[in-house]
Structures are given as structure tokens and as C-alpha cells.
Amino acid sequence: MASNYRFAIFLTLFFATAGFSAAALVEEQPLVMKYHNGVLLKGNITVNLVWYGKFTPIQRSVIVDFIHSLNSKDVASSAAVPSVASWWKTTEKYKGGSSTLVVGKQLLLENYPLGKSLKNPYLRALSTKLNGGLRSITVVLTAKDVTVERFCMSRCGTHGSSGSNPRRAANGAAYVWVGNSETQCPGYCAWPFHQPIYGPQTPPLVAPNGDVGVDGMIINLATLLANTVTNPFNNGYYQGPPTAPLEAVSACPGIFGSGSYPGYAGRVLVDKTTGSSYNARGLAGRKYLLPAMWDPQSSTCKTLV
């Protein structure tokens, strides 16, 4: 069974409208996430990309640069301005050491060979197009004019296995799907770069790469890549039932900086020139806003700033 990533803005905003405050969050107990003794994706992992629909070269470069940045040592990192790699380094604290992601093959399907309305089986079929092996993740990215089953209703993306038995590593390679929500549900899948559909209508943050849809995809892609390497076959790290697990990042919804509370992303960095919000620096001068990740050592949701 694929593990869906529900960007938990509705839950977050529910708590906000129910009167939860920042002070209430301080009293939260440590978050416990159990390891279920399954295989994790550690070592060198190839990330293959399937672009379904029309993406501009700039949009593709923002996403590819992000993946390259996850393990790059070429970007300076400090407490004041962290790097994308420093965010990804938290995955090393999970059993098995580091996960080094390397961009592999890319496939452009700009002519919509399966149409513009995709069902769940189509995502798995698309993930097999590049014949990724067991030490790979195939990422399927759908353009803004492509609708996907349950997209914007209960999920912004998903991860799973291409095999018939998703709990067995030998049964198939891992895959991720993320959709561009720009014209369909930016208030659901691209928050905090767009006002939320429900809850307090606080001003949205300015997207660091000037593209609400793609910057929202980065948040969801970051979430799903971290969830995939730490729970690729639904028997790694997660909390709750395996049919609806809370994973490395999805267990920390709506948190991007210190002082966050439901409906407020937290204190993040702001570019003095563009006014855009970010918390991590990547290759090619890119800036990204990345979500909090559960830290196994502290049992808390760790933010970069």
C-alpha cells in the first residue's frame, strides 16, 4: 500500500480555530516513532525523474538543483543560514547511516501519454518507465494541468513500492509522486506560499524561487524523500497504523521555523531583496523552505532555524 502524504494543513488549522496557542505547543511531550525492523534506503541511492506534462526548464532546474543539494558539500552552512544538506543530514540519525541521493535518468513525457487525469495505478506504471533498481527511487512529477486521483482532496503526493507486495524490498523499487498544485489547490498543497483554504487567513509567505506551485512541490518532495528513505516499504520508521502512517516529516506538519504554532509556519529567514521566505540554501544560489523533520536522538521535530 502506498503511503500518502497529506500536508496536514487542515489538522493544523483545526487546532488554530479551536483555540490552541503557541504556549500550548511548548508543553507537548516528545514524539515517539517506532522502528518496525524493516529495510531502509541507505548508502548510495539513485533518484530517477519522470516529468509528466509540461514543465519549464527553470521549473525543472529548481527541482533538480534541490535534489543535488541534499548531499552537496559545496554549499556553506551556518547556524544563521543552514544548507539543504544540513537538513538532510538528520536522516543519518535513523538506523543504517547516511542516504546519499544521486540524480540518475530523466524522462520527459510532455505529450500526456496517459491523458490528463491519472488514477493510482498509472502512478505506479509511470514509476517503472525508467527501470529503477532496488537501490533507487523513481520520482513522478505531474504538471499543474494534470489531475490525479485524490490529489487536493486528501493528499499532495505519495510514496510506495512498484512491486505487488509493498512490504518486501525485493518485490519492487521505491517511488514517489508529487503534483503541482498551482492551479488546483495551492491553499492545501503549497501552504505557506498561499493563503489556506480554511482557518486564519494570514498573509502567505513569498516563494523563494518565485513559483508558488514549484516551491510547494519542493516542500512535498522533501517530505516524501525523507519519508521514503526512512520507511520505504512500510516497515521502517513510522507512528500509528501502517495504512495511515506518520513518518519522518509528515509527523511534523506545518512546522518550518522556531516558534511555530497551528496556522503559523514559524520564524524563517527573509531575503532582503525579494522578500521571499526560506530556511535553507542550496546549489546555484537557490533558496528553499524545508519542513521540520523528526530527530530520533531528541524525539522532537527539528527545524533548521
From Swiss-Prot:
The keyword Chaperone does not apply. It comes from the Eukaryota. The keyword Ion transport does not apply. GO terms for cellular component: apoplast; Golgi apparatus; plant-type cell wall; plasmodesma; plastid. This is Protein EXORDIUM-like 2. Belongs to the EXORDIUM family. It comes from Arabidopsis thaliana (Mouse-ear cress). Transmembrane segments: none annotated.
